[in-house]
Amino acid sequence: MKKKIIISLISIIILTIPLFILVQNNLENSDEIIAKESLITYQSNLEEKFKIDGYTIDNPNIILDPYDASPLTALVLFETNDEVEPTITIVGKDELTTYTYESKKSNKHYLPIYGLYADYENTIIIEYGDVRKEITIKTNPLPDNFILPTSIKADKEKLSNDLYFFTPSSRGYTCAYDTNGDVRWYLTNYAIWNINKLKNGHMLVSTERLINAPYYMTGLYEIDMFGKIYNEYSLEGGYHHDYYEMPNGNLLVASDNFNSDEGTVEDYIVEIDRQNGNIVKKFDLKSILNMEDGKSENWSSYDWFHNNAVWYDDKTNSITLSGRHQDAVINISYETGNLNWIIGDSTNWSSEYQKYFFKPVGDNFE
């Protein structure tokens, strides 16, 4: 029995719909908006190639990298007389790297093909009813500057046929590897920090544009596995490190307030309304914590907290954040922004914050 593909999204710092752009109302740089609308228009124009009339399973329309953004993907288009539900198999080098999934029932078929090998004659099997069609898709090599794993270790008895997604924290490619360490998906557009699957099946990645050095990006793209952009969320304070999709669909985003009097970074959280792109809530950590407390080795007055994680807990209606430069994990109320608790070493913290620290219990703590 063929396994269904399970796509596991892993983010390392160490999937026709109208196209539109959601931008923050007070974004000042209109040139950036125009530039990105042009890219979305470019992708929309590419859909003119997605012709299906007259194509059959014996002579399908095969489009490699349909949105010019994800070279190891393809689109296979054809018509059938009756409504059928095709099964697609991307043949791998073994069972764990072979992916099988079903398409929707229709007589007009736009079959997404994900997980091709680079520089390879990929075999794709399409089946429905008594029909079995085998097609070959030849891909191009990886870019010369694509950094590959130097050592691969896998306990395959404990693995399933997943794709494992990676993002860089600086330069590199957002990509996915199979259990053999072969690249099976990547984006040509520069995207860093987090990558997660949204509830609607799309993914969220950074834009490719810097708003401030060294790694503060202008915002986030909502994309699918083709790299097709559905929405852009632009932020006046940019985006870095992490975001979280809330139960209502809004996004909590690690951001910055570049206009603050203190001139600090990585101490600001915003909530984006997914329907219109507006900022509906802000959390300024400077009003919650003492900037001079809990200094780690890399602490500076400019980057005093260095928030690198955002998490929302629905049960307690609270937000958990990770401050590398204060060596602390903190939790605040979503409603009020008040501090709830701190995990870390309380030694170098002011007396007013001592009551918020959890007390270690047991022999495992020093």
Segments (PLM) and residue ranges:
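Extracellular low-complexity, O-glycosylation-prone stalks/linkers
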Residues: 89-97
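Beta-rich interaction/scaffold domains
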Residues: 22-30, 129
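Histidine-/acidic-rich catalytic cores in large beta-rich domains
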Residues: 37, 56-90, 109-110, 114-121, ...
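Hydrophobic alpha-helical membrane-insertion segments, chiefly the h-region
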Residues: 14-24
